[in-house]
């Protein structure tokens, strides 16, 4: 059994991207092990998939029902909350502590890892001052980020999200991963390379520079393999590469809250000529996340909301209590209804009729004040020097479970001992998590 497990989350990677010529390092890893399509969880979004893999359980258990959460008690939506305590199931590092194996765990740039039981944690945590933002990362042990800062430079949050998001984020994270691998020698190391995610959302699944981006990500994998070789652990190391989801090409958004407002379900408060959502008095609203929307409905309005959803072009499915159970998303945090878009659509959070009445944060990179995920933050309008309000700019999305023949995420390893099912079958993300826990 391997003494070191290195798990690399390469967002958006698919089986068709892997070849000896284009991605030789990833290809070589697969040659002594296996390559499998992944059966991901619903919704196929970052926080949900990561929690499912790390805990070996479904959202109905761990409670991370999307990248955002809605607090019904104080009518508040929050996206990208980092606290580990939000995950309601034991993850790999918790199991390590319970079993007392002495294994050391490290996790870099995964979601919901602040204050976790992992021995080593690194995650972006910018500090918002009155006049500026301090680019900082939370680290455990304290001082780890400061050591990295001295060795490889600061982590710039604009590389990680927004109009300037780029492969620089993946490159910095890889360098940090090398540092942790060499200096801490963890038994379990989880790291994250995000830059394909930006490219697919901006450009769709078949953009011109995709080969360059794949070669770049493959070079990063090669650097980690080389580092494991140089520090003498390669013979006792299992590499696992996986992706959280595949992308579909999209051509426009569906502004569910605007439609709900047209049907007098959404209430707003106008303050200084700006319209803000009033969730206290709204009969229903949608917390949107890519191609999935959790819809929270006041009592006695479920049937009318469902009827409205059924009439919206581009809405593929509406999940009620029974279908939520079938997809293992029946958790108290979930919406009363869940809408799923067609493959060529995604849900935007917009609620205004007149863009001039939209809040100032709508035209900024502001991941915490918007009641939904906003991929348009990847774009910039030079004429207004702000984030545009045009959902048609987005060309790729995810979140829905793939239908037959659609693209799926991929699992690659240099070991072949995960084959608990027929090798022709897809490998469940939950099965991967249970497998990892059994390696302890």
Model regions and ranges:
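Metal-dependent active-site segment of extracytoplasmic phospho-/sulfohydrolases and closely related
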Residues: 6-7, 25, 216-261, 265-266, ...
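Glycine-/proline-rich flexible loop or hinge segments
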Residues: 8-12, 31-36, 46-51, 68-81, ...
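Residue-level preference for the first positions of well-ordered beta-strands
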Residues: 4-6, 187-190, 238, 336
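Short, structured active-site-proximal loop/turn typified by the sulfatase FGly-forming signature C/S-X-P-X-R
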Residues: 18-61, 104-106
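Active-site neighborhoods of enzymes that stabilize oxyanions during catalysis
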Residues: 89, 277-435
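Short, solvent-exposed loop/turn segments at the edges of secondary structure
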Residues: 46-48, 234, 255, 260, ...
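Short secondary-structure boundary/capping segments
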Residues: 22-25, 121-125, 204-208, 253-260, ...
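His/Asp/Glu-rich, glycine-adjacent segments
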Residues: 57-204, 216, 287, 294-297, ...
């Amino acid at each position: 059994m391997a003494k070191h497990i290195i798990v690399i989350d390469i967002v958006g990677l698919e089986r068709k991207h892997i070849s000896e010529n284009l991605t030789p390092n990833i290809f070589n890893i697969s040659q002594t092990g296996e390559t499998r399509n992944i059966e991901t969880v619903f919704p196929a979004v970052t926080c949900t998939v990561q929690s499912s893999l790390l805990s070996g359980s479904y959202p109905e258990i761990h409670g991370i029902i999307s990248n955002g959460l809605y607090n019904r008690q104080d009518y508040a939506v929050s996206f990208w909350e980092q606290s580990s305590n939000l995950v309601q199931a034991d993850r790999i590092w918790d199991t390590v502590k319970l079993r007392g194996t002495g294994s050391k765990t490290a996790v870099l740039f995964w979601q919901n890892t602040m204050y976790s039981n992992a021995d080593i944690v690194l995650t972006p945590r910018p500090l918002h001052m009155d006049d500026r933002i301090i680019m900082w990362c939370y680290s455990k042990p304290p001082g780890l980020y400061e050591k990295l800062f001295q060795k490889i430079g600061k982590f710039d949050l604009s590389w990680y999200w927004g109009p300037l998001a780029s492969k620089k984020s993946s490159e910095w994270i890889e360098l940090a991963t090398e540092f942790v691998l060499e200096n801490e020698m963890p038994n379990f190391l989880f790291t994250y390379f995000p830059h394909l995610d930006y490219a697919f959302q901006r450009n769709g699944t078949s953009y011109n520079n995709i080969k360059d981006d794949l070669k770049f990500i493959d070079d990063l994998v090669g650097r980690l393999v080389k580092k494991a070789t140089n520090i003498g652990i390669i013979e006792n190391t299992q590499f696992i590469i996986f992706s959280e989801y595949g992308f579909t090409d999209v051509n426009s958004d569906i502004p569910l809250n605007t439609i709900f407002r047209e049907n007098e379900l959404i209430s707003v408060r106008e303050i200084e000529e700006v319209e803000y959502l009033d969730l206290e008095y709204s009969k229903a609203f949608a917390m949107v996340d890519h191609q999935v929307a959790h819809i929270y409905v006041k009592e006695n309005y479920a049937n009318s909301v469902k009827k409205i959803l059924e009439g919206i072009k581009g809405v593929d499915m509406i999940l009620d209590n029974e279908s939520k159970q079938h997809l293992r998303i029946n958790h108290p945090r979930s919406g009363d209804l869940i809408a799923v878009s067609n493959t060529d659509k995604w849900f935007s959070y917009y609620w205004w009729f007149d863009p001039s009445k939209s809040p100032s944060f709508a035209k900024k990179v502001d991941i915490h004040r918007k009641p939904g995920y906003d991929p348009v933050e990847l774009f910039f309008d030079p004429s207004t020097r702000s984030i545009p309000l045009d959902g048609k700019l987005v060309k790729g999305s995810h979140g829905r479970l793939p239908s037959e023949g659609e693209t799926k995420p991929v699992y690659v390893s240099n070991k072949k001992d995960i084959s608990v099912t027929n090798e022709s079958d897809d490998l469940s993300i939950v099965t991967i998590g249970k497998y990892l826990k059994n390696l302890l």
